[in-house]
């Protein structure tokens, strides 16, 4: 039971992190209008690429934990 609660807790934290990353991505895109040099554009491009990669990894972790939670719940109910 403790493992299930731990997985649910981490799943919720992962969802919160995804929301924060989406907000960060929007803020970075809003600052794209203030770019003056190519170096600024390169920094923004790298930052956006890193946030997108992190979002993909967090979504994968979320799906794995969600599957684990569902599996544990089915085992407990049977």
From Swiss-Prot:
InterPro entries associated with the record: Corona_7
Q: Which organism is it from?
A: Porcine transmissible gastroenteritis coronavirus (strain FS772/70) (TGEV)
- What does the record give as the function of this protein? Inhibits the integrated stress response (ISR) in the infected cell by promoting EIF2S1/eIF-2alpha dephosphorylation. Acts as a functional homolog of host PPP1R15A/GADD34 to recruit PP1 phosphatase and dephosphorylate host EIF2S1/eIF-2alpha. May function in the formation of membrane-bound replication complexes or in the assembly of the virus.
- Name-wise, this protein is Non-structural protein 7
Q: Membrane topology per the record?
A: Single-pass membrane protein
Localisation: Host membrane
- What subunit structure does UniProt give? Interacts with serine/threonine-protein phosphatase PPP1CC/PP1-gamma; this interaction; this interaction probably promotes EIF2S1/eIF-2alpha dephosphorylation.
Q: In the UniProt record, does the keyword Transmembrane helix occur?
A: yes
Ranges in the topological domain labelled Lumenal:
24-57
Q: Where are the transmembrane segments?
A: 58-78
Q: Which residues form the signal peptide?
A: 1-23
Q: Got a GO cellular component term for this one? A: host cell membrane
Q: Which UniProt keywords apply?
A: Host membrane, Membrane, Signal, Transmembrane, Transmembrane helix
Q: Give the family this protein belongs to, as stated in its UniProt record.
A: Belongs to the coronaviruses ns7/ns7a protein family.
Q: Where is this region: Interaction with PPP1CC/PP1-gamma?
A: 54-65
